[in-house]
Swiss-Prot record:
Protein name: 5-formaminoimidazole-4-carboxamide-1-(beta)-D-ribofuranosyl 5'-monophosphate synthetase
Binding site for ATP: 125-185, 207
Residues that, per the record, bind Mg(2+): 273, 286
NCBIfam families registered for this protein in UniProt: PRK13278.1-3
Ranges of residues in domain ATP-grasp: 81-328
Originating gene: purP
Key words, A-Z: ATP-binding, Ligase, Magnesium, Manganese, Metal-binding, Nucleotide-binding, Purine biosynthesis
PROSITE patterns assigned: ATP_GRASP (PS50975)
Catalytic activity, EC: 6.3.4.23
Summary of the function given for this chain in its UniProt record: Catalyzes the ATP- and formate-dependent formylation of 5-aminoimidazole-4-carboxamide-1-beta-d-ribofuranosyl 5'-monophosphate (AICAR) to 5-formaminoimidazole-4-carboxamide-1-beta-d-ribofuranosyl 5'-monophosphate (FAICAR) in the absence of folates.
Domain of life: Archaea
Pfam families: DUF1246, DUF1297
Lineage, broadest ranks: Archaea, Methanobacteriati, Methanobacteriota, Thermococci, Thermococcales
Length: 337
Protein backbone atom coordinates (compact mmCIF):
# COMPACT_ATOMS: atom_id res chain seq x y z
CA UNK A 1 0.00 0.00 0.00
CA UNK A 2 1.39 3.39 -1.03
CA UNK A 3 1.53 5.90 1.81
CA UNK A 4 0.11 9.31 0.84
CA UNK A 5 2.28 12.25 1.87
CA UNK A 6 0.13 14.94 3.46
CA UNK A 7 1.37 18.53 3.31
CA UNK A 8 0.13 21.43 5.40
CA UNK A 9 -0.92 24.59 3.60
CA UNK A 10 -2.21 28.01 4.52
CA UNK A 11 -2.79 31.45 3.03
CA UNK A 12 0.34 33.62 3.13
CA UNK A 13 -0.74 36.15 5.76
CA UNK A 14 -2.02 36.47 9.34
CA UNK A 15 -0.39 33.55 11.23
CA UNK A 16 1.13 31.61 8.32
CA UNK A 17 4.70 31.91 9.65
CA UNK A 18 3.67 30.27 12.92
CA UNK A 19 1.51 27.61 11.25
CA UNK A 20 4.18 26.56 8.77
CA UNK A 21 6.97 26.59 11.37
CA UNK A 22 4.83 24.40 13.62
CA UNK A 23 4.11 22.03 10.72
CA UNK A 24 7.81 21.67 9.94
CA UNK A 25 8.52 20.99 13.62
CA UNK A 26 6.06 18.08 13.38
CA UNK A 27 7.74 16.69 10.26
CA UNK A 28 5.42 17.97 7.51
CA UNK A 29 6.29 19.58 4.21
CA UNK A 30 4.64 22.98 3.96
CA UNK A 31 2.83 25.12 1.40
CA UNK A 32 2.07 28.84 1.42
CA UNK A 33 -0.13 30.42 -1.24
CA UNK A 34 -0.88 34.05 -1.96
CA UNK A 35 0.54 37.07 -3.79
CA UNK A 36 3.94 37.05 -5.51
CA UNK A 37 5.03 40.05 -3.44
CA UNK A 38 5.09 38.15 -0.14
CA UNK A 39 6.82 35.03 -1.47
CA UNK A 40 10.27 36.09 -0.12
CA UNK A 41 8.79 36.46 3.37
CA UNK A 42 8.04 32.72 3.51
CA UNK A 43 10.88 31.35 1.38
CA UNK A 44 13.84 33.70 1.99
CA UNK A 45 13.55 35.91 5.06
CA UNK A 46 11.70 33.26 7.10
CA UNK A 47 12.14 29.98 5.15
CA UNK A 48 9.13 28.07 6.46
CA UNK A 49 7.45 27.18 3.13
CA UNK A 50 8.70 24.25 1.06
CA UNK A 51 6.31 25.30 -1.71
CA UNK A 52 4.96 28.73 -2.58
CA UNK A 53 1.96 28.83 -4.91
CA UNK A 54 1.02 32.16 -6.44
CA UNK A 55 -2.71 32.77 -6.48
CA UNK A 56 -5.69 33.55 -4.30
CA UNK A 57 -6.62 29.89 -3.99
CA UNK A 58 -4.79 27.47 -6.37
CA UNK A 59 -7.09 24.52 -5.69
CA UNK A 60 -5.80 22.13 -8.37
CA UNK A 61 -2.19 22.49 -7.22
CA UNK A 62 -3.18 22.07 -3.57
CA UNK A 63 -5.09 18.90 -4.40
CA UNK A 64 -2.14 17.55 -6.38
CA UNK A 65 0.16 18.16 -3.40
CA UNK A 66 -2.25 16.39 -0.98
CA UNK A 67 -2.61 19.54 1.10
CA UNK A 68 -4.61 20.03 4.26
CA UNK A 69 -5.51 23.72 4.49
CA UNK A 70 -5.36 25.53 7.85
CA UNK A 71 -7.88 28.41 7.98
CA UNK A 72 -6.91 31.83 9.31
CA UNK A 73 -8.70 35.15 9.56
CA UNK A 74 -7.05 36.38 6.36
CA UNK A 75 -7.95 33.16 4.56
CA UNK A 76 -11.65 33.56 5.32
CA UNK A 77 -11.65 37.34 4.72
CA UNK A 78 -9.94 37.11 1.30
CA UNK A 79 -11.74 34.04 -0.03
CA UNK A 80 -15.14 34.56 1.54
CA UNK A 81 -17.26 32.08 3.45
CA UNK A 82 -19.08 30.73 0.38
CA UNK A 83 -15.88 29.81 -1.48
CA UNK A 84 -14.38 28.21 1.61
CA UNK A 85 -17.51 26.13 2.11
CA UNK A 86 -17.24 24.87 -1.50
CA UNK A 87 -13.50 24.18 -1.55
CA UNK A 88 -12.45 20.61 -2.30
CA UNK A 89 -9.12 20.67 -0.45
CA UNK A 90 -9.37 19.09 3.03
CA UNK A 91 -9.93 21.85 5.59
CA UNK A 92 -8.79 21.46 9.20
CA UNK A 93 -11.82 22.07 11.39
CA UNK A 94 -15.57 22.21 10.93
CA UNK A 95 -16.65 24.40 7.99
CA UNK A 96 -20.14 24.70 9.47
CA UNK A 97 -18.65 26.97 12.14
CA UNK A 98 -17.84 29.64 9.53
CA UNK A 99 -21.45 30.69 9.07
CA UNK A 100 -21.92 31.02 12.83
CA UNK A 101 -18.72 33.00 13.30
CA UNK A 102 -19.18 35.43 10.38
CA UNK A 103 -22.82 36.35 11.14
CA UNK A 104 -22.97 38.34 14.38
CA UNK A 105 -26.58 37.34 15.03
CA UNK A 106 -25.77 33.63 14.82
CA UNK A 107 -22.60 34.26 16.82
CA UNK A 108 -24.72 35.88 19.53
CA UNK A 109 -27.01 32.84 19.60
CA UNK A 110 -23.97 30.58 20.01
CA UNK A 111 -22.48 32.60 22.86
CA UNK A 112 -25.85 32.81 24.60
CA UNK A 113 -26.19 29.03 24.30
CA UNK A 114 -22.79 28.78 26.02
CA UNK A 115 -24.17 30.88 28.89
CA UNK A 116 -21.36 33.43 28.63
CA UNK A 117 -21.63 36.94 30.03
CA UNK A 118 -22.31 39.19 27.05
CA UNK A 119 -22.72 42.91 26.41
CA UNK A 120 -26.18 44.21 25.55
CA UNK A 121 -26.96 44.39 21.83
CA UNK A 122 -29.13 47.18 20.38
CA UNK A 123 -31.39 46.27 17.46
CA UNK A 124 -32.50 49.88 17.01
CA UNK A 125 -29.83 52.62 17.13
CA UNK A 126 -32.46 55.07 18.36
CA UNK A 127 -32.51 53.08 21.62
CA UNK A 128 -28.84 53.77 22.39
CA UNK A 129 -28.68 55.03 25.98
CA UNK A 130 -25.01 54.45 26.82
CA UNK A 131 -21.68 54.19 24.97
CA UNK A 132 -21.72 51.49 22.28
CA UNK A 133 -19.18 49.96 19.92
CA UNK A 134 -20.37 49.39 16.37
CA UNK A 135 -18.98 46.39 14.47
CA UNK A 136 -19.47 45.25 10.86
CA UNK A 137 -19.96 41.49 10.41
CA UNK A 138 -16.97 39.27 9.63
CA UNK A 139 -13.27 39.14 10.50
CA UNK A 140 -11.69 42.43 9.45
CA UNK A 141 -9.08 43.03 12.14
CA UNK A 142 -11.10 45.76 13.83
CA UNK A 143 -11.50 47.86 10.68
CA UNK A 144 -14.71 49.85 10.62
CA UNK A 145 -15.31 49.65 14.39
CA UNK A 146 -16.27 52.89 16.13
CA UNK A 147 -17.68 54.21 19.40
CA UNK A 148 -20.96 56.13 19.61
CA UNK A 149 -22.47 57.79 22.68
CA UNK A 150 -26.07 58.40 21.54
CA UNK A 151 -28.32 57.98 18.46
CA UNK A 152 -27.21 61.25 16.85
CA UNK A 153 -23.54 60.37 17.29
CA UNK A 154 -24.25 56.91 15.86
CA UNK A 155 -25.84 58.18 12.64
CA UNK A 156 -23.08 60.72 12.09
CA UNK A 157 -20.34 58.12 12.45
CA UNK A 158 -22.02 55.18 10.71
CA UNK A 159 -22.29 57.29 7.56
CA UNK A 160 -18.72 58.53 7.92
CA UNK A 161 -17.09 55.14 8.57
CA UNK A 162 -19.40 52.68 6.82
CA UNK A 163 -21.37 54.78 4.33
CA UNK A 164 -24.70 53.77 5.90
CA UNK A 165 -27.57 56.27 5.86
CA UNK A 166 -30.70 54.36 6.91
CA UNK A 167 -31.82 51.45 9.10
CA UNK A 168 -32.35 49.10 6.15
CA UNK A 169 -28.58 49.01 5.60
CA UNK A 170 -27.80 48.02 9.20
CA UNK A 171 -28.33 44.27 8.71
CA UNK A 172 -24.55 43.69 8.45
CA UNK A 173 -23.73 45.74 11.54
CA UNK A 174 -23.97 44.93 15.24
CA UNK A 175 -24.35 47.60 17.92
CA UNK A 176 -22.89 46.40 21.23
CA UNK A 177 -22.81 47.99 24.64
CA UNK A 178 -19.25 49.20 25.27
CA UNK A 179 -18.09 47.36 28.39
CA UNK A 180 -15.35 49.07 30.38
CA UNK A 181 -12.57 46.68 31.33
CA UNK A 182 -9.20 45.19 30.43
CA UNK A 183 -9.15 43.47 27.01
CA UNK A 184 -8.23 39.79 27.30
CA UNK A 185 -8.02 37.30 24.43
CA UNK A 186 -7.53 33.68 25.59
CA UNK A 187 -6.50 31.20 22.90
CA UNK A 188 -7.81 27.65 23.12
CA UNK A 189 -7.33 24.35 21.32
CA UNK A 190 -9.95 21.63 21.44
CA UNK A 191 -8.83 18.17 20.37
CA UNK A 192 -11.39 16.01 18.62
CA UNK A 193 -9.10 13.03 19.19
CA UNK A 194 -8.76 13.33 22.97
CA UNK A 195 -11.91 15.38 23.67
CA UNK A 196 -9.81 17.76 25.76
CA UNK A 197 -9.69 21.56 25.86
CA UNK A 198 -6.30 23.24 26.19
CA UNK A 199 -5.54 26.85 27.12
CA UNK A 200 -2.71 27.70 24.76
CA UNK A 201 -1.92 31.36 25.44
CA UNK A 202 -3.42 34.81 26.05
CA UNK A 203 -2.83 38.18 24.42
CA UNK A 204 -4.16 41.67 24.17
CA UNK A 205 -4.27 43.68 20.95
CA UNK A 206 -2.33 46.77 19.98
CA UNK A 207 -4.79 48.87 17.99
CA UNK A 208 -4.68 52.07 15.97
CA UNK A 209 -5.54 54.65 16.97
CA UNK A 210 -7.08 53.79 20.35
CA UNK A 211 -3.75 52.74 21.87
CA UNK A 212 -1.99 55.90 20.68
CA UNK A 213 -4.66 58.50 21.30
CA UNK A 214 -3.82 58.67 25.02
CA UNK A 215 -0.48 60.28 24.12
CA UNK A 216 -2.41 63.36 22.98
CA UNK A 217 -3.62 65.65 25.80
CA UNK A 218 -7.42 65.55 26.23
CA UNK A 219 -7.71 69.27 25.42
CA UNK A 220 -6.03 68.69 22.06
CA UNK A 221 -8.13 65.58 21.40
CA UNK A 222 -11.27 67.68 21.73
CA UNK A 223 -9.93 70.46 19.53
CA UNK A 224 -8.81 67.99 16.86
CA UNK A 225 -12.17 66.16 17.03
CA UNK A 226 -10.40 62.81 16.88
CA UNK A 227 -12.43 59.66 16.30
CA UNK A 228 -11.27 56.47 18.01
CA UNK A 229 -10.59 53.51 15.72
CA UNK A 230 -9.69 49.88 16.45
CA UNK A 231 -7.57 48.59 13.57
CA UNK A 232 -5.32 45.81 14.87
CA UNK A 233 -1.60 46.50 14.34
CA UNK A 234 -0.03 43.86 16.56
CA UNK A 235 -0.39 41.71 19.65
CA UNK A 236 1.04 41.82 23.17
CA UNK A 237 1.54 38.65 25.29
CA UNK A 238 -0.45 38.49 28.52
CA UNK A 239 -0.22 36.24 31.56
CA UNK A 240 -3.50 36.29 33.42
CA UNK A 241 -3.88 36.49 37.17
CA UNK A 242 -3.97 32.82 38.23
CA UNK A 243 -7.25 33.12 40.15
CA UNK A 244 -8.96 34.15 36.88
CA UNK A 245 -7.79 31.20 34.79
CA UNK A 246 -10.74 28.96 35.64
CA UNK A 247 -13.10 31.69 34.42
CA UNK A 248 -11.63 31.62 30.92
CA UNK A 249 -11.23 27.82 30.87
CA UNK A 250 -14.85 27.23 31.89
CA UNK A 251 -15.99 29.75 29.27
CA UNK A 252 -14.07 27.78 26.66
CA UNK A 253 -15.58 24.47 27.79
CA UNK A 254 -19.12 25.87 27.55
CA UNK A 255 -18.40 27.27 24.09
CA UNK A 256 -17.28 23.86 22.83
CA UNK A 257 -20.34 22.16 24.35
CA UNK A 258 -22.70 24.69 22.73
CA UNK A 259 -21.00 24.17 19.36
CA UNK A 260 -21.61 20.42 19.56
CA UNK A 261 -25.33 21.06 19.98
CA UNK A 262 -25.65 23.82 17.38
CA UNK A 263 -23.31 22.93 14.52
CA UNK A 264 -21.81 19.51 15.06
CA UNK A 265 -18.77 20.61 17.01
CA UNK A 266 -15.86 23.02 17.21
CA UNK A 267 -12.36 21.57 17.09
CA UNK A 268 -8.91 23.00 16.64
CA UNK A 269 -7.98 26.53 17.74
CA UNK A 270 -10.37 29.31 18.72
CA UNK A 271 -10.38 32.51 20.75
CA UNK A 272 -12.94 34.19 23.00
CA UNK A 273 -12.51 37.94 22.74
CA UNK A 274 -13.57 39.85 25.81
CA UNK A 275 -12.76 42.02 28.78
CA UNK A 276 -12.37 41.58 32.51
CA UNK A 277 -14.39 44.25 34.30
CA UNK A 278 -13.33 45.92 37.58
CA UNK A 279 -15.62 43.37 39.29
CA UNK A 280 -13.55 40.56 37.66
CA UNK A 281 -16.37 39.42 35.39
CA UNK A 282 -15.23 37.95 32.06
CA UNK A 283 -17.52 39.54 29.47
CA UNK A 284 -17.20 38.03 25.98
CA UNK A 285 -18.04 40.16 22.96
CA UNK A 286 -17.16 37.77 20.14
CA UNK A 287 -15.51 34.51 19.10
CA UNK A 288 -12.89 33.75 16.48
CA UNK A 289 -13.40 30.10 15.60
CA UNK A 290 -9.91 29.54 14.16
CA UNK A 291 -6.31 30.44 14.92
CA UNK A 292 -5.94 34.14 15.78
CA UNK A 293 -2.94 36.41 15.18
CA UNK A 294 -2.70 36.88 18.95
CA UNK A 295 -0.99 33.47 19.09
CA UNK A 296 1.96 34.78 17.04
CA UNK A 297 4.01 36.01 20.03
CA UNK A 298 4.14 32.38 21.19
CA UNK A 299 5.94 30.65 18.31
CA UNK A 300 8.26 29.07 20.88
CA UNK A 301 5.39 28.30 23.25
CA UNK A 302 3.66 30.15 26.09
CA UNK A 303 3.86 29.79 29.89
CA UNK A 304 0.70 27.67 29.68
CA UNK A 305 1.90 25.29 26.97
CA UNK A 306 5.21 24.83 28.79
CA UNK A 307 3.27 23.70 31.85
CA UNK A 308 1.48 21.04 29.79
CA UNK A 309 4.03 19.97 27.18
CA UNK A 310 7.44 20.85 28.63
CA UNK A 311 8.59 21.59 25.07
CA UNK A 312 8.02 24.45 22.61
CA UNK A 313 4.37 24.24 21.55
CA UNK A 314 2.75 27.03 19.57
CA UNK A 315 -0.86 26.88 18.43
CA UNK A 316 0.46 26.32 14.91
CA UNK A 317 2.48 23.33 16.05
CA UNK A 318 -0.48 22.00 18.07
CA UNK A 319 -2.58 22.01 14.89
CA UNK A 320 0.13 20.05 13.06
CA UNK A 321 0.44 17.58 15.92
CA UNK A 322 -3.30 16.94 15.86
CA UNK A 323 -3.10 16.23 12.13
CA UNK A 324 -0.07 13.97 12.59
CA UNK A 325 -1.79 11.99 15.35
CA UNK A 326 -4.96 11.74 13.27
CA UNK A 327 -2.94 10.31 10.36
CA UNK A 328 -1.20 7.82 12.67
CA UNK A 329 -4.56 6.72 14.09
CA UNK A 330 -6.17 6.62 10.61
CA UNK A 331 -8.61 9.35 11.69
CA UNK A 332 -7.67 12.22 9.39
CA UNK A 333 -11.21 12.31 7.97
CA UNK A 334 -12.49 13.05 11.48
CA UNK A 335 -10.53 16.30 11.87
CA UNK A 336 -11.02 17.77 8.38
CA UNK A 337 -14.11 18.82 6.46
Amino acid sequence: MVKIVVRIATYASHSALQILKGAKDEGFETIAFGSERVKPLYTKYFPVADYFLVGKYPEDELLELNAVVIPTGSFVAHLGVELVERMKVPYFGNKRVLKWESDRNLERKWLEKAKLKLPRVYDDPDDIDRPVIVKPHGAKGGRGYFIAKDPQDFWTKVEKFLGIKDKEDLKNVQIQEYVIGVPVYPHYFYSKLTRELELMSIDRRYESNVDAIGRIPSKDQLELELDITYTVIGNIPLVLRESLLMDVIEAGERTVKAAEELMGGLWGPFCLEGVFTPDLDFVVFEISARIVAGTNPFINGSPYTWLKYDEPMSTGRRIAREIRLAIEEDKLDEVVS
